[in-house]
């Protein structure tokens, strides 16, 4: 049963997430794994991946060293199994309700508990939960996970769908798959299948934590704070609380901040799910500001539900109060595209980010801290989470909240049409709802964007000529269903105050100057167009959401993956760490325009770094000079997922390139 309870609260602040109950037991130790039904069991790390567990056990060599990547493509063709034997903690064993929570499984996984089927998963971008109240033993429990090959499962899904899809970034040939690009048929990080800056290392495994949780009669499931109107004078807010209980009972709801009770009201619950709506107002709120505009003020609140004076459920939340919107308004020059924070138009100084590692569980909290502080210290105020990676860890968004970094959040779709059969749409719907609910309380979240470059691809990348009319029409239909219907409907339902952008870019195309007057632009003229950097002075869009130029990482990074015998642009190892087909040629060609091309490899690497920094500073300063016509400059890209020749300003080991230093100057 569902019951809606409306509480009028006199004063309250705002929220983002951490709870006291339920009781939690982490299940991260004493795992073992092996290839399915083959060989002996080996120790495993959880969270982890099959690849990293094989590395840790000495079964394979470092995939990042020299050209080892090509020697381990067999891993993604096999099934793998993980097993844990555990006992339930005494305190948790006494709870009435118990569930297993899998925060991230990559990707196709069949789960049993004590021999009983529990779940079959098909999406790495969401949490999976299972009620295990009647399945747990008071002695030893056996949790077993079988990960199906993402390649073989992808082939099955492709055959069921019955239509080919481009997925040009899927390095299927490198993986021994010929033309079979299966990445689009699994809800799995696209970049794992390869990109023009990344290797093909298609992982499986428990990539986020698993835990057992238990509670008795009452559990606060979620708290969401909507901010219908926030001004320096007053913030009108609305808190929505979802809780489950077994009983019809009267409770006292209290809202606290700094141990002070801000609101107190009686709540009458019914068995099942209950929803509480709490409207409230704050006078003269301390507003949240982006980096460079002011302080990123945050409030921490606690909601307590009490029975007979005792706290029976609690949820603590932190967020900031602000008005943040994307302004798209027709003007005499076309249509504006800028972010407005607390009534102030903001020039977005920022960058596109990819995942910090191919092997996601390797990314630590300190890695995220360095990522966000490096952006803030370079005077940035925005990071775009690009649609070919992952929805980032909660801690990343918490850091952006603290440092005043606005987040442009893509849904995880990039550079290719996608299926739109009912089963696929169901997976996408569940993924979207989960991540919208998970992230919507973050003050830093500026907007949702449906995809990266798919509409541009449909219009300009030759798919219409390459494919039969009926297949191309299916691609158009799939785009319409996913990005014009399903995703905007979910944003409207679960995060109604946030702007949804269909795709990036939508109107503008770097080869068509007449289109730059509307929307955001990805200008790849200085790379794929092989134009000089000076063209950035005149090719000015309303908002530059991608532009870039490659460089080598510095020599100390190259030494981690190559030996001196490999120090040649045409060596097999250097080519293995250069995923752009024109990359090394174009770096050398452009260097010859602006500088003398050194003969010594180490000098060539150094001058490549100088070249990248010079060219990209040229673009950033041109965008800022053309304010307010142009209101954003987002570099491609911030970081790397392995040691590689790429467009990044910070290499895999965290070293700033010349471009990042030039960014700090250009954005000052």
Predicted regions mapped to residue ranges:
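Beta-strand-rich binding/interaction modules
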Residues: 111-113, 234-268, 276-278
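Substrate-binding/catalytic cleft of secreted carbohydrate-active enzymes
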Residues: 382-402, 406-575, 611, 615, ...
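Short glycine/proline/serine/threonine-rich loop/turn segments at secondary-structure transition edges
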Residues: 93-96, 136-140, 282-298
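Extended carbohydrate-recognition surfaces in non-catalytic/accessory domains of CAZymes
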Residues: 19-101, 180-209, 213-218, 235, ...
């Amino acid at each position: 049963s569902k019951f809606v309870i409306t509480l009028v609260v006199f004063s309250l602040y705002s929220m983002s997430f951490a709870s006291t109950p339920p009781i939690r037991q982490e299940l991260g130790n004493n795992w073992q794994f092996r290839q399915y039904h083959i060989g002996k069991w080996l120790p495993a790390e959880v969270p982890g991946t099959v690849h990293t567990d094989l590395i840790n056990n000495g079964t394979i060599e470092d995939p990042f060293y020299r050209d080892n990547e090509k020697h381990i493509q067999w891993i993604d063709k096999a099934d793998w199994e993980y097993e844990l034997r555990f006992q339930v903690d005494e305190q948790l064993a006494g709870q009435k309700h118990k569930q297993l929570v899998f925060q991230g499984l990559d990707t196709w996984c069949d789960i049993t508990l004590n021999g009983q089927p529990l779940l079959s998963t098909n999406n790495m971008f969401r949490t999976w939960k299972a009620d295990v109240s009647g399945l747990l033993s008071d002695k030893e429990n056996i949790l077993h996970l079988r990960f199906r090959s993402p390649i073989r499962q992808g082939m099955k899904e492709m055959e069921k769908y019955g239509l080919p899809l481009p997925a040009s970034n899927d390095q299927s040939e490198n993986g021994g798959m010929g033309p079979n690009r299966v990445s689009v048929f699994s809800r799995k990080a696209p970049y794992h299948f390869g990109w023009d800056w990344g290797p093909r290392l298609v992982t499986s495994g428990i990539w986020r934590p698993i835990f057992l949780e238990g509670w008795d009669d009452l559990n606060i499931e979620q708290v969401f704070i909507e901010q219908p109107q926030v001004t320096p004078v007053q913030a009108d807010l609305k808190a929505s609380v979802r809780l489950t209980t077994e009983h019809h009972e009267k409770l006292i709801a209290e809202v606290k901040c700094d141990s002070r009770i801000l609101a107190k009201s009686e709540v009458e619950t019914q068995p099942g799910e209950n929803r509480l709506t709490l409207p409230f107002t704050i006078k003269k709120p301390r507003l949240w500001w982006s980096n460079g505009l002011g302080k990123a003020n945050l409030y921490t609140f606690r909601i307590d539900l009490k029975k007979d004076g005792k706290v029976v459920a609690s949820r603590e939340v932190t967020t900031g109060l602000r008005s943040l919107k994307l302004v798209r308004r027709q003007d005499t020059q076309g249509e504006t595209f800028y972010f407005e924070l607390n009534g102030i138009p903001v020039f977005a100084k920022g960058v596109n980010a990819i995942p910090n590692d191919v092997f996601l569980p390797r990314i630590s909290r300190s890695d995220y801290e360095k990522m966000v502080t490096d952006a803030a210290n370079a005077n940035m105020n925005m990071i775009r989470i690009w649609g070919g990676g992952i929805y980032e860890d909660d801690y990343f968004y918490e850091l952006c909240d603290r440092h005043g970094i606005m987040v442009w959040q893509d849904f995880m779709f990039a550079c290719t049409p996608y299926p739109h059969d009912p089963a696929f749409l169901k997976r996408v719907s569940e993924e979207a709802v989960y991540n919208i609910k998970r992230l919507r309380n973050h003050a830093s979240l500026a907007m949702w964007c449906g995809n990266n470059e798919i509409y541009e691809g449909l219009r300009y990348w030759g798919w219409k000529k390459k494919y039969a009319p009926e297949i191309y029409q299916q691609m158009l239909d799939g785009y319409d269903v996913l990005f014009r219907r399903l995703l905007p409907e979910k944003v409207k339902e679960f995060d109604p105050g946030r702007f949804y952008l269909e795709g990036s870019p939508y109107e503008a195309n770097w080869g068509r100057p007449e289109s730059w007057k509307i929307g955001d632009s990805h200008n790849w003229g200085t790379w794929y167009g092989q134009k000089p950097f000076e063209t950035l002075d005149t090719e000015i869009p309303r908002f530059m959401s991608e532009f870039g130029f490659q460089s080598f990482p510095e020599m100390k990074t190259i030494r981690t993956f190559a030996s001196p015998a490999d120090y040649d642009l045409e060596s097999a190892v250097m080519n293995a760490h250069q995923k752009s087909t024109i990359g090394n040629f174009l770096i050398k060609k452009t260097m010859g325009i602006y500088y003398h091309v050194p003969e010594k490899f180490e000098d060539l690497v150094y001058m490549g770094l100088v070249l990248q920094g010079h060219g990209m500073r040229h673009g950033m300063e041109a965008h800022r000079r053309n304010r307010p016509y142009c209101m954003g400059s987002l570099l491609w890209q911030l970081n790397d997922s392995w040691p590689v020749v790429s467009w990044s300003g910070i290499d895999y080991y965290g070293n700033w390139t010349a471009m990042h230093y030039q960014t700090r100057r250009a954005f000052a």
